[in-house]
Amino acid sequence: MCTAATYKTNDFYFGRTLDYESSYGEEIVIMPRNFPLNFVNMGRIATHYAVIGTAHVAQDYPLFYDAANEKGLAMAGLNFVGNSFYRDDIDGKDNVAQFEFIPWILSQCANVTEARTLIEKINITKTQFSPQMPSGQLHWIIADKNDCIVVESVKEGIKVYNDPVGVLTNNPPFDMQMFRLNDFRGLSPKQPENTFSDKLDLTSYSRGMGAMGLPGDLSSQSRFVRAAFVKMNSRSAPDEQSSVSQFFHILNSVDQQRGCCEVAEGKYEITIYTSCCNTDKGIYYYTTYNGHQISAVDMHKEDLYSAKLIAYPMITGEIINFQN
């Protein structure tokens, strides 16, 4: 269970929460321009755009959860259990394994328009990374500063949706998530007027009553509505610090606390990490469940012409600033 969002001020910001009951040793990974990408069916890409994001590195391969490239295109895969459907290879298609999809797009595409063109030819296959690592059931959000789409590989084929809110969670399929927003069209950040009856003197006895009815539970549909409302109504100064701070506030609205979402006896889904990438500057910010201080990695401070992955372990401990 996860939530992804976009935000734009002077720069463009993209990030997500990773909500799960256990970690797989995620790291902040930079894939430099000359790191060789060997695809199962699509040959080798020796030189490509540099990419930064969160990944689990296995056999020197970055299994990205979310990432952005040096051109400002960003992408994340979110759980889509029960609805995702991957196929065997299809003649005449670009047969890309599920775990290769993020590198396939971000290594070659500078914007969403180019990604759309590449996706027209794609078949996302069920080829596993290894027998011990089955293909994740995912759908994807792809965004730049001007456009945002959602890609779903389902039984009917590849579906590409425009995403005007710049938010994605999990089930149900994206078109159903968007339709659900119609049920909340009356919500507002402003105080409500009395439309119940002009014969009753009803008053707004508390601030925030314009958003009464905004879902507060942790289900994916409710998180979509809540994140969309918060994102669409967010306001901040346009500078970097204010924008990054506001982005984390947006995703903190769907934060999951240990104990509130039990997935098995004694096991709870939590927000393992929250990310925010300034895709214009190539700076990847993040927090973790036990590390609320914002940490950052700047891809442009590394040798982007290298052929080796660069990885930074996530800071997972709390850092408390004592003032006396």
What are these regions, as identified by a protein language model?
Residues 28, 68, 149-153, 275:
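Broad, structure-driven detector of short, well-ordered beta-strand segments within folded domains
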